[in-house]
Amino acid sequence: MVSSFSVPMPVKRIFDTFPLQTYAAQTDKDEAVALEIQRRSYTFTERGGGSSELTVEGTYKLGVYNVFLEANTGAALATDPWCLFVQLALCQKNGLVLPTHSQEQTPSHTCNHEMLVLSRLSNPDEALPILVEGYKKRIIRSTVAISEIMRSRILDDAEQLMYYTLLDTVLYDCWITQIIFCASDAQFMELYSCQKLSGSIVTPLDVENSLLQKLSAKSLKISLTKRNKFQFRHREIVKSMQGVYHNHHNSVNQEQVLNVLFENSKQVLLGLKDMLKSDGQPTYLHLKIASYILCITNVKEPIKLKTFVENECKELVQFAQDTLKNFVQ
């Protein structure tokens, strides 16, 4: 009687003829993922070429929507004003120099502070920037937490606090509406996503991809309106974006709101000229001003806000460039 645990003779003959071979362990490292991480990583360096020994627990990683290379300095800057403000503030606090290229070009094998291009979905509230400190004892600071910390540092100066608040409400709202409604989807995605929209539609697959990309852009726009309490200040705008049908009445109201925001922003920008004087290193208000100006002038399409800044606020543009030079080699 054959036991249920015995090996059938035909199978036994095969394994006797072709014995099992032990293979070496295979690495589980995904090279494609590693290269993508390097492509999205930008390393800060110490001012003056210093090289203090950093451990993994002593480093931070700043998550942003996307980056651009600034034309005059070659610095890799965040494309969003809030992200760029935190980037500049971290450089000033830690004595760092802005990155100029990704790790894809020059991989780093040492522990350094980094800026990473991330999806908004990397944060539960779908907003960036986020700041990750340490590795094993990891501390993750959300956009709201970062904003509260930065704001707390100027509470003692009423005038700076007033302008800081105006920038993060009036000018911020104008920036968001101009990028969402006045720029193309391709321009918007270039600023707030590492995905690029395809401009050519040839095959049915291209049509399908184009529709998916438009849905992705709309989803990202809606999530952006939830940052900095924008949705509470402009309920009608957000409501019209979430609706299936966008009627003429909503379009007229939206245009009126955009015009009011733009006019108010013009007054704020023109009033900043008296706040540009500095004794020594830039203040947090100066970094905030420079962040908005650099991001506005980076927009490739001629939105009204960019045109006004370049034509009527040349002093602010020069101030932003001078501020940026504090953080380049």
Curated annotation (Swiss-Prot):
Q: What does the UniProt entry say about where the protein is found? A: Mitochondrion outer membrane
Question: Which InterPro entries does the record match to this protein?
Answer: SAM35
An example GO BP is: mitochondrial outer membrane translocase complex assembly
Chief subcellular site?
mitochondrion
Cellular component terms, GO, for this chain's entry? mitochondrial outer membrane; mitochondrion; SAM complex
Q: Which UniProt keywords apply?
A: Membrane, Mitochondrion, Mitochondrion outer membrane, Protein transport, Transport
Q: What else is known?
A: Present with 1470 molecules/cell in log phase SD medium.
Q: How does it assemble?
A: Component of the mitochondrial outer membrane sorting assembly machinery (SAM or TOB) complex, which at least consists of SAM35, SAM37 and SAM50.
This chain's function reads: Essential component of the mitochondrial outer membrane sorting assembly machinery (SAM or TOB) complex, which is required for the sorting of proteins with complicated topology, such as beta-barrel proteins, to the mitochondrial outer membrane after import by the TOM complex.
User: Which protein is depicted?
Assistant: Sorting assembly machinery 35 kDa subunit
This chain's source organism reads Saccharomyces cerevisiae (strain ATCC 204508 / S288c)
Q: What is the lineage of its organism?
A: Eukaryota, Fungi, Dikarya, Ascomycota, Saccharomycotina
